[in-house]
From Swiss-Prot:
Residues bearing the modification Omega-N-methylarginine: 14
Species the sequence originates in: Mus musculus
Function (record text): Mediates Rho signaling to activate NF-kappa-B and may confer increased resistance to apoptosis to cells in gastric tumorigenesis. May play a novel role in the organization of septin structures.
InterPro entries: AHD, Cytokinesis/Rho-signaling, HR1_rho-bd, PH_domain
Protein name, entry field: Rhotekin
Lineage: Eukaryota, Metazoa, Chordata, Craniata, Vertebrata
Length: 564
């Protein structure tokens, strides 16, 4: 009998909406069972969604130009990957539906019995030439604009990006040092290369533009008219309205625009430097326009997996051309376009030289047979190659029909891979593994002398000299005599050695009521400690009595030449 306290029983009304949801859920689980590949793709999709949320938060919080550019770039890359992963998941689900229902795709093409092996595709030495005007590059005229550019590369659902490069008119081409590697590429791949750019406004370039504009207008229009124009500009700025003749600043960070793109296929693969055409998508009126020449130079290499990984191995008895004996018992390894024959299987693992090698190329002919007079090795596999007018045949003897079938399938798969990858199977192209990318480093800004001064009033002289010594980068001598004018203790003579210096006076100790000294990160002295006391900072060298008066600008020593 049904009891409310009985937790092991659940009743659902027949035909209710809840029952239909349960049935629909069971149908989905049984009909769309996710494969490990789909699970991995879903995990990547979830990761990119979290990365996009983090990039949005970072873009809303960052205040530096470099941070905003990197956050915007990350947001664009994450959005591209999310769209790519969602499209791939949708395609796989549709294929599952067609397979379960027994329907064929719209093109009604029979599925191939053999699918070509995948390979590694690497693009490196990327350079995009620029085409500046003569007045901009040679005569160095006009405003100096800067662009932040990067490349987005895609093969299927795999999307990679390069580091961001700052470009101005001092550069003749855009150079990317990254080696972009795609580990899972098919022979019919299409590598789409997209160049994105954003115009970078210099910080502080427009900060004083309203006041400078008002000053120029007031001086050019005369005293009376200029005063009225200046007053109107000041009132507009004080009322909170946008300054006249100045655009409203953009909200949401910088915007990257698609400047050019191209598509590279297997035909463009070459073990060398090559130039490809670019399709330009921006015009000169675009704020992110960059004077591109219309081409990209790069090295595109490909490594099919059949060329770098063994596809078959096992015990063989090889009878070479011209031999009348039963053959030599070897361990054969099919790798690339060669069948390597070793004495033992351990020799292949340790990388020793093979006993001999049988070449297998596109012109090789393979024929299977059976020998009645060899009961231990009854099955044969003949491999024939032509060298000019001569034909050389090597015969492989195998123990079982299953071994013969495995070697035949491996050879037919190799022939099929060579027909799909074509010239990439002639020789193994060199591909360097990309180095781990370092995080972008923001440009260090040196604080002014005002922000680096100490806060305690009794310690100002020591703080200033300490900062100047840190900027100069040299070890300064003991305190000069003029420092005694600001203290109660007489200055030490110049002949005193460091060992005879008296202990640190009481006034040099940190004050209990004062705020701690604050320095900028680039001017923090390395020898400051966090203990209760600190040593006297090195002071400037002594000066002659003549140098204690007024100085002209040309007589200042290097330790006083500090930007304020």
């Amino acid at each position: 009998m049904f009891s409310r306290n009985h937790r092991s029983r659940i009743t659902v009304a027949r035909g209710s909406a809840l029952e239909m949801e349960f049935k629909r859920g069971r149908f989905r689980l049984s009909f769309f069972s996710e494969s490990p590949e789909d699970t991995e793709l879903q995990r990547k999709l979830d990761h990119e969604i979290r990365m996009r949320d983090g990039a949005c938060k970072l873009l809303a919080a960052c205040s530096q130009r470099e941070q905003a550019l990197e956050a915007t770039k990350s947001l664009l890359v994450c959005n591209s990957r999310i769209l790519s992963y969602m499209g791939e998941l949708q395609r796989r689900k549709e294929a599952q539906v067609l397979e379960k229902t027994g329907r064929r795709p719209s093109d009604s093409v029979q599925p191939a019995q053999h699918s070509p092996c995948r390979g590694r595709v690497c693009i490196s030495d990327l350079r995009i030439p620029l085409m500046w005007k003569d007045t901009e590059y040679f005569k160095n005229k006009g405003d100096l604009h800067r662009w932040a550019v990067f490349l987005l590369l895609q093969i299927g659902e795999q999307i990679q990006d390069t580091e961001m490069v700052l470009v101005d008119r001092t550069l003749t081409d855009i150079s990317f040092q990254n080696n972009v590697l795609f580990a899972e590429a098919e022979p019919d791949f299409e590598l789409r290369l997209e160049l994105y750019g954003a115009c970078v406004e210099e910080e502080g370039a427009l900060a004083g533009a309203p006041k400078r504009l008002a000053t120029k207008l007031s001086s050019s229009l005369g005293r009376s008219s200029g005063k009225r124009v200046r007053a109107s500009l000041d009132s507009a700025g004080a009322s909170g309205n946008s300054p006249v003749l100045l655009p409203t600043p953009a909200v949401g960070g910088p915007r990257f625009h698609l400047l050019a793109h191209t598509t590279l296929t297997l035909e463009e693969v070459q073990d060398g430097f090559r130039t490809h055409d670019l399709t330009l998508t921006s015009h000169e009126e675009n704020p992110a326009w960059l004077p591109l020449y219309g081409s990209v130079c790069c090295r595109l290499a490909a490594q099919p997996l059949c060329m770098i990984q063994p596809t078959a191995s096992g015990a063989l008895r090889v009878q070479q051309a011209g031999e009348l004996q039963n053959g030599t018992l070897v361990h054969g390894v099919l790798k690339g376009t060669n069948l390597f024959c070793y004495w033992r299987s351990e020799d292949a693992d340790t990388g020793q030289e093979p006993l001999f090698t049988i070449v297998i190329n596109k012109e090789t002919r393979v024929r299977a047979g059976e020998l009645e007079q060899a009961p231990e090795w009854p099955f044969t596999l003949s491999i024939s190659n032509k060298y000019g007018d001569d034909e050389v045949t090597n015969t492989l003897q195998l123990e079982s029909r299953e071994a013969l079938q495995n070697w035949m399938e491996a050879l037919w798969q190799l022939f099929f891979d060579m027909s799909q990858w074509r010239h990439c199977c002639d020789e193994v192209m060199k591909i360097e593994t990309p180095a781990p990318r370092k995080p972008p480093q923001a440009l260090a800004k040196q604080g002014s002398l005002y922000h680096e001064m100490a806060i305690e009033p009794l310690d100002d002289i020591a703080a200033v000299t300490d900062i100047l010594a840190q900027r100069e980068g040299t070890r300064l001598e003991p305190s000069p005599p003029w420092l005694a004018m600001f203290t109660d203790q007489p200055a030490l003579p110049s002949s005193c050695s460091p060992a005879s210096v008296a202990p640190v006076p009481t006034w040099m100790q940190p004050l209990p009521w004062g705020r701690p000294r604050t320095f900028s990160l680039d001017a923090a002295p390395a020898d400051h400690s966090l203990g209760p006391s600190r040593s006297v900072a090195p002071l400037p060298p002594q000066r002659s009595p003549k140098s204690r008066g007024f100085y002209s600008k040309s007589q200042l020593g290097p330790w006083l030449q500090s930007p304020v």
